[in-house]
Amino acid sequence: MNFVLSDVADAEAEKAIRDPLVAYNLARFGESDKRDLNITIRNDDNSVTGGLVGHTARGWLYVQLLFVPEAMRGQGIAPKLLAMAEEEARKRGCMGAYIDTMNPDALRTYERYGFTKIGSLGPLSSGQSITWLEKRF
């Protein structure tokens, strides 16, 4: 047995690790009901300028990315995106949502929207911390 440390991505090795892990998780937890959930902010020319990227799975909404263009900030767009995602997640039978952030401004926005801190890690090398939050519906 050899252990090989590398700083180069190896798609073949990743697949060899991922596939049996996915099979194990399927056997242990059953099929996932994961569904993507994306909300885009588009310009008049239909180009995407921001939005929300996430998914629902196993009764929870995960908000992976949320971006509002700087010129649109402070206009209630982030809460609108979160509300739209929450509404769809409820329709899908979710009991809550979770999100993580390193941005102190985003953290305040999420807390104002009803998310509560459930954990943090830090300081990171940048001096910031990463915070995980949840909101139960």
Swiss-Prot record:
EC number(s) from the headed UniProt entry: 2.3.1.-
Residues annotated to bind CoA: 66-68, 74, 108-110
UniProt xrefs under CDD domains: NAT_SF (cd04301)
Keyword set, alphabetical order: Acyltransferase, Transferase
InterPro entries according to UniProt: Acyl_CoA_acyltransferase (IPR016181), GNAT_dom (IPR000182), YpeA/RimI_acetyltransf (IPR050680)
Function: Catalyzes the transfer of an acetyl group from acetyl coenzyme A (AcCoA) to an acceptor substrate and releases both CoA and the acetylated product. It prefers glucosamine 6-phosphate or dopamine. It can also use the thialysine, N(8)-acetylspermidine, chloramphenicol, puromycin, polymyxin B, and 4-aminobutyrate ethyl ester.
Full protein name: Acetyltransferase Atu2258
Organism expressing this protein natively: Agrobacterium fabrum (strain C58 / ATCC 33970) (Agrobacterium tumefaciens (strain C58))
